[in-house]
Amino acid sequence: MAFTQPPLPFPKDALEPYGMKAETFDYHYGKHHAAYVTNLNKLVEGTPMESLSLEDVIKQSFGDSSKVGVFNNAAQVWNHTFFWNCLKAGGGGAPTGELAAKIDAAFGSLDKFKEEFSNAAATQFGSGWAWLVDDGGTLKVTKTPNAENPLVHGQKPLLTLDVWEHAYYLDFQNARPAFIKNFLDNLVNWDFVAQNLAA
């Protein structure tokens, strides 16, 4: 069974008032994400991995030098689908309930979390991702290079930000810190993060 690209969870122009152009999604979703899906299907066709879940393909191919292409494409399919759900028109603000309490417990305050997350995203050299994860019941900020994600480290992803240049260049050019601030202030879908925590 072929892997498929889920639809965006919002119209491609929905985030324009919040700093992300429809053109960004034409390229980022329409070309980059779509290409990862196409490449993954070509790489696993006729192999036992074809029938696995995307998560299992990621876990089984990680660290296997003969399956680098499979891992990179599978992880990027998963990462992007997860990232789109982390975005919401008019998002940002503050989380509530258990999520807010866990963030306060782990980081001291929402502002301290934002500072740590922003630092992770800004200092990821080259391409990669910044994450908020549940690591055995404790919330942590982490960052991963290229396609890597927390699933391969036994962590539960709660929130991510794509810091590959193609994620922000049309909107923010080389100003990655401005992209990060805009994400935290205007786009974070805290409802999705809370669902991930509760799952």
From Swiss-Prot:
Annotated function: Destroys superoxide anion radicals which are normally produced within the cells and which are toxic to biological systems.
Origin superkingdom: Bacteria
Protein name: Superoxide dismutase [Fe]
Gene expressing this chain: sodB
Family in the record: Belongs to the iron/manganese superoxide dismutase family.
Originating species: Leptolyngbya boryana
Enzymatic class: oxidoreductase
UniProt-annotated binding residues for Fe cation: 28, 80, 162, 166
Catalysed reaction equations from the record: 2 superoxide + 2 H(+) = H2O2 + O2
Compartment(s): Cytoplasm
Species classification: Bacteria, Bacillati, Cyanobacteriota, Cyanophyceae, Leptolyngbyales
Cofactor: record remark: Binds 1 Fe cation per subunit.
Subunit architecture: Homodimer.
Pfam families: Sod_Fe_C, Sod_Fe_N
InterPro entries: Mn/Fe_SOD, Mn/Fe_SOD_BS, Mn/Fe_SOD_C, Mn/Fe_SOD_N, Mn/Fe_SOD_N_sf, SOD_C_sf
Keyword terms, alphabetized: Cytoplasm, Iron, Metal-binding, Oxidoreductase
Main location: cytoplasm
Gene3D superfamilies per the UniProt record, alphabetical: Fe,Mn superoxide dismutase (SOD) domain, Iron/manganese superoxide dismutase, C-terminal domain
EC number: 1.15.1.1
Annotated GO CC locations: cytoplasm
Listed cofactors: Fe cation
GO MF: metal ion binding; superoxide dismutase activity
Induction statement: Expressed constitutively, although partially repressed under conditions of iron stress.
